Amino acid sequence: NFTKGSGSSVYIADIDKYTDSQVFPGHVWDGFVDDGNGVNHIDVKNCNIFNFGSGAIVINGTDVHLDNNHIKNIGGTALYLRGGDLETLTPSNNEILNNNIHHVGYLQKSYVPAIGMHGVGIYVAYNDLYDAPHCIFNYHGNDHVIEYNKIHDAVKECLDMDAIYTRNEYVPQWRGSVIKNNYIYNIGIYPVGEYKKQLNVSAIRTDNYGHALQIYNNVFA
């Protein structure tokens, strides 16, 4: 129920809105990508997505649900999801739930998170996210919720970075996001012979005057 676009990418416009229990072995480009015009009512669930040299899933749209997928061995960002209207604050109703995402950014190394988000009202919960040289989350926009995720073994090869990262000094209207009830551990530790601790690493950072956020009930270990 899908067709392949150029470079063997799977274009969202060709998926018939729903992909369930498929296996997508990788190649050098992105995995799922939208057609550039935005899409809506997309479900990708119960899929195994692995060995992509760039991103695994790149979608700009609304009512997008990425649920219970196993994504691994990704050269860049595993999931990049955009959606919602930043002018009217209309939420995207996009969700990223119950995914196992690991071993990301093995080629590009920095600013290629497990999950990148931009827009309004993206909900991310109950994911197991780990093994990244840089950040796990890099998000921008309004009214996102990041909760009940297990985040570990990240920022292994870089300094001055964090497991969950945002910055909004140039766009102070980006506000209202909530980060709560996450379990975050083994950040900035990379085993090279003896364990090495990276410098200036945190679990959560709101960089350069990041503000108007709620951060509570997270566990750090």
Residue ranges and their predicted role:
Residues 138:
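Conserved SAM-binding loop
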Residues 5-35, 51-58, 74-87, 107-116, ...:
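Extracellular beta-strand/beta-solenoid scaffold signature
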